[in-house]
């Protein structure tokens, strides 16, 4: 018996009907083979539109439904639920996007948009006739979560999940949690001491009964699927026993070796045995074997006997139900902007370096100085958008926090010494957050910070005084301005971590063109990813400030808690399937599979492919490569795809004749 198809065309207000003649599309659809009813409605996704579809299914005994509307990314689940409530399999729906594919791209050609919509509907009807029900598989979800990254995003997510009773493994590659926020002096717009508000959370997460900290460690491999991720972690040797070290510092006091301190961005020094900063969590010392001379003084000074020169890397294997990626960011490499002389001129520094200077616990005791001579600068110039909004260095995006960083540090400099002249050379001041515009006005009106709209072309150094000549066109005044500065601060942008591609491949995630992790939907699913059970948070997803980072971390914790709370997850089995009678065992499909989901068994004297339908993600690579057609992707079988193409071409011929 031939399937009975119903076609439902949505106006989407004027988004579709303003360009596409929806009534003509309906009239065309009514005449297609197998179509027993076709209807239009202004908003098919609204309750009246949904009821229209349900009533038509019952009245006309429909067993296939075609909806011509907007993007399936947003509304396909809505219509699947609709036909399911009417008694049909949710997989007997074929969704046609006539908004993005017709009205939006042909908005100046009503006839062309309408014809294209007709052709797409014709193809959809042919495919709908061949749709199949898709089975579902229920997997148990382990009530535990791996969080990659121990910055404020990872800490907040860990606390939220731990408070709900879930086991959390918080992995941080540095010796201490805290991330970038731990390096800051104060936070805008409230000027809170950064560590004063961060440290209590660091201590809370370390002492939480449901949170296990795994610091100085990196994720090396991730396999499996939602509910059952198998994770391999390599914990680097500290050469200090974490369970014995008391953090007293006696070892560092006798260590004769001093090297640049990475936490202070090289502005200060640390010993070969060290903690990154005084409030580090865990407060456990680490020996830097690249610089340790094995003199043994630390071992002699250590009362508890915690030094372990023979410590080896440790492999940790975990099974978790969900994962949150919160790996943070790196500061843009300002040496790539050669015209600004960073790394060449001593008195050109970055915002983060200034943060460490201004921090009372930093290398200069909270005093901004000129690196060339240690003197206090009396004229400071900030240059904005260094590594942001700059196609020349491949950074098209705005880093979002640099303007506020500069405003904060400019005010702090003026607070330390009101006589200091501070200039900010900017393209646009983007003070978008709550209280940010008022903060901007305060810098202008209360502190007298001077703003020059323009991007400096270059910086030159006076070789004798080490002063810097900043030449910039003030686009508001229409004139060239030269400033002789004691110190230049580059507002370096936020760059994705260089190992993001490696981690993305490991997790099965995508990266945006800018190198940050890609969300499932930028507006409706900003913390979810294409892999069920894996969420993203903080600057791993894209540049953002601390409030947005914390909010997104809480959102990610909420997202992964849902399947853990339910204890199980339904997987729709749109997976590869094998026709064993046709399979020749050539093994081409296994070579194409990125998930190692295909194995082979011997049957009737030759090899036959087998698919692990849980490991398989339904990408279709194997089906596309199979020379015999034995490997098919359920719901996207060859005949289903070809029938759609045939339907489009036949309709095109009919409309053109």
UniProtKB/Swiss-Prot annotation:
List of residues binding [4Fe-4S] cluster 4: 593, 616, 619, 622
Record-level GO BP terms: methanogenesis
A family per Pfam: Fer4_9
Subunit structure: The ferredoxin:CoB-CoM heterodisulfide reductase is composed of three subunits; HdrA, HdrB and HdrC.
UniProt similarity note: Belongs to the HdrA family.
Biological role: Part of a complex that catalyzes the reversible reduction of CoM-S-S-CoB to the thiol-coenzymes H-S-CoM (coenzyme M) and H-S-CoB (coenzyme B).
The protein, known as: CoB--CoM heterodisulfide reductase iron-sulfur subunit A
Source organism of the structure: Methanocaldococcus jannaschii (strain ATCC 43067 / DSM 2661 / JAL-1 / JCM 10045 / NBRC 100440) (Methanococcus jannaschii)
Gene giving rise to this polypeptide: hdrA
């Amino acid at each position: 018996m031939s399937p009975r198809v119903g076609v439902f065309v949505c106006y989407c207000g004027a988004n579709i009907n303003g360009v596409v003649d929806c009534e003509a599309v309906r009239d065309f659809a009514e005449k297609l083979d197998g179509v027993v009813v076709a209807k239009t409605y202004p908003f098919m996704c609204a309750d009246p539109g949904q009821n229209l579809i349900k009533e038509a299914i019952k009245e006309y005994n429909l067993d296939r439904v075609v909806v011509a509307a907007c993007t399936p990314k947003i509304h396909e689940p809505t219509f699947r639920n609709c036909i399911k409530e009417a008694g049909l399999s949710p997989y007997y729906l074929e969704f046609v996007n006539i908004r993005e594919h017709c009205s939006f791209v042909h908005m100046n050609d009503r006839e062309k948009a309408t014809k294209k919509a007709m052709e797409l509907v014709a193809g959809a009807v042919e495919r709908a006739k061949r749709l199949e029900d898709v089975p579902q598989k229920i997997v148990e979800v382990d009530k535990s979560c791996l969080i990659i990254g121990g910055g404020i995003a990872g800490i907040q997510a860990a606390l939220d999940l731990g408070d709900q009773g879930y086991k959390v493994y918080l992995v941080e590659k540095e010796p201490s949690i805290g991330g970038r926020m731990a390096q800051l002096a104060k936070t805008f717009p409230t000027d809170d001491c950064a560590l004063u508000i961060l440290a209590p959370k660091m201590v809370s997460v370390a002492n939480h009964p449901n949170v296990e900290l795994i610091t100085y460690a990196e994720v090396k491999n991730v396999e499996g699927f939602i509910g059952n991720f198998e994770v391999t972690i390599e914990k680097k040797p500290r050469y200090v026993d974490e369970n014995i070290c008391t953090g007293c510092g006696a070892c560092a006091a006798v260590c004769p070796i001093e090297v640049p301190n990475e936490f202070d961005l090289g502005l200060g020094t640390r010993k070969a045995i060290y903690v990154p900063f005084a409030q580090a969590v865990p407060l456990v010392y680490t020996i830097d074997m690249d610089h340790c001379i094995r003199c043994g003084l630390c071992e002699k000074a250590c009362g508890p006997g915690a030094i372990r020169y023979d410590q080896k890397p440790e492999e940790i294997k975990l099974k978790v139900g969900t994962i949150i990626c919160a790996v943070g960011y790196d500061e843009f490499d300002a040496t790539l902007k050669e015209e600004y002389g960073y790394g060449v001129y001593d008195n050109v520094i970055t915002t983060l370096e200034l943060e460490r200077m201004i921090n009372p616990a930093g290398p200069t005791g909270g005093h901004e100085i000129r690196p060339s001579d240690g003197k206090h600068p009396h004229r400071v110039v900030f240059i904005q958008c260094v590594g942001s909004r700059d196609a020349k260095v491949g950074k098209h995006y705005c880093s979002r926090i640099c303007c506020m960083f500069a405003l904060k540090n400019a005010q702090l400099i003026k607070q330390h010494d009101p006589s200091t002249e501070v200039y900010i050379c900017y393209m646009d001041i983007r003070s978008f957050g709550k209280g940010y515009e008022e903060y901007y006005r305060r810098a202008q009106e209360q502190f007298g910070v001077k703003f020059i709209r323009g991007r400096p072309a270059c910086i030159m150094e006076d070789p004798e005084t080490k002063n810097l000549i900043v030449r910039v066109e003030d686009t508001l005044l229409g004139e060239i301005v030269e400033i002789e500065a004691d110190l230049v601060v580059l507002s370096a942008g936020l760059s994705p971590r260089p190992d993001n591609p490696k981690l993305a491949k490991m997790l099965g995630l995508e990266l945006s063109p800018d190198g940050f992790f890609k969300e499932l939907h930028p507006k409706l699913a900003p913390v979810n990813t294409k892999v069920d059970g894996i969420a993203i948070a903080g600057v791993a997803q894209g540049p953002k400030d601390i409030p947005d980072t914390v909010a997104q971390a809480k959102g990610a914790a909420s997202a992964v808690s849902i399947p853990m709370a339910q204890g199980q997850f339904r997987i729709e089995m749109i997976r590869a399937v094998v026709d064993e009678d046709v399979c020749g065992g050539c093994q081409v499909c296994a070579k194409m599979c990125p998930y190692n989901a295909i194995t082979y068994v011997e049957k009737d004297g030759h090899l036959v492919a087998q698919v692990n339908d849980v490991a398989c993600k339904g990408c279709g690579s194997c089906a596309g490569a199979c020379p015999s057609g034995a490997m098919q992707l359920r719901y996207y079988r060859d005949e289903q795809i070809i029938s759609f193409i045939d339907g489009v071409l036949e309709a095109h011929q009919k409309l053109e004749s």
